[in-house]
Amino acid sequence: AAKPHDNVANGLGYLWNPTKVLMEKTTPAAEDKPREIVGAKALEEAKAEVAASGGALKLREVGVMEQLWNPSLWLAAAGQIFFSRSVGFSVIIVYASYMKKNDDVVLSGLTASSANEFCEVGLGGLITVPAAVAFLGVAGVAGQAGVGLGFKILPLVFSKMPAGAFFGGAFFFMLFLAAVTSSISMLQPGIAFVEESLGVGRKASVTILGLLTTFGTGFVLYFTANLKALDTLDFWIGTFLIFVLATIQIIIFGWKWGIDRGFEELHRGAAIRVPWIFRPIIKWICPGFLLSIFVMWLMKEIFGYDFAKGSMGAVSGYVTDLFGEKSNLPAQLSMALVIAIFVFFGLLTARSKAYARAEQGLPKHD
């Protein structure tokens, strides 16, 4: 049957969806999660279910300000931005070490950031989400992850295009190349690290890192039930740890390195200058903002304080998966794997001659 309300225009409206309707228990337990109600038909069914529950269920409207009080939302958003810009892990630091002294960091950084956001938001979100609403409807889109949604929707879009098979094949082939090159770029810091810490050649370094990567990939593939291992590693490493390390990096740049010295290096060879206003932003506002998000996240997800309601709520599932009565073995093994890798690389660093020379203020090589 035709569904005229499922169209691209409504999909664009769905992107700006500041108000949500949740159905939840009147007296929820710690493990109970509210269910989001999307669409007019679903809302009518939810109202009937609430009326028949005898007061056990209720509908609650969540406005934009209440959602903005959720520190997990800010942590996830910041983690995504840092990951897409390679900030918060060693990639950007390693590749920066290969630059020449007078290379233009300002213009190239501005170009890369602008192009990245245009592709992610403009070409990604503004194409995928409206198309998903047109094909699946609002209820079919709600709660789905962006990457998985794209793989489901874009083939449908290409199937409706002239020469869609050609354009679809070309798109996913280029996506494959982008994924391969991105993976290689993220392996380079580890390769360089093993080379310096062990004093081995590139072949030996690639072999060691390849074995570690193969083991980690096999571990995730083995624990595929509910994607628990992948989800655990993605959150604690791909979101939480990147956020923490990015916060540390900006504090080091603004305070340890020094904002004046940093801007002097930043403008060396630059075609344009960074406005003065970014000095207090980098030194004061960004660290304060990121630390505030981190503290609020700890209070909400670790200690269970709900800022929107001003009362105690549920602890994060990522925490209860690791500790407590409802701990999850794949999640615990995932974190044990991460800790083991940290210890391994920590031991490599401790015995590294290059690290010892750096501690003494000496150059890396004689």
State the predicted function of each range.
Residues 1-9, 70-73, 100-104, 127-139, ...:
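Transmembrane helix-loop junctions in multi-pass membrane proteins
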Residues 186-200, 225-230, 251-277, 356-358:
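Alpha-helical transmembrane segments
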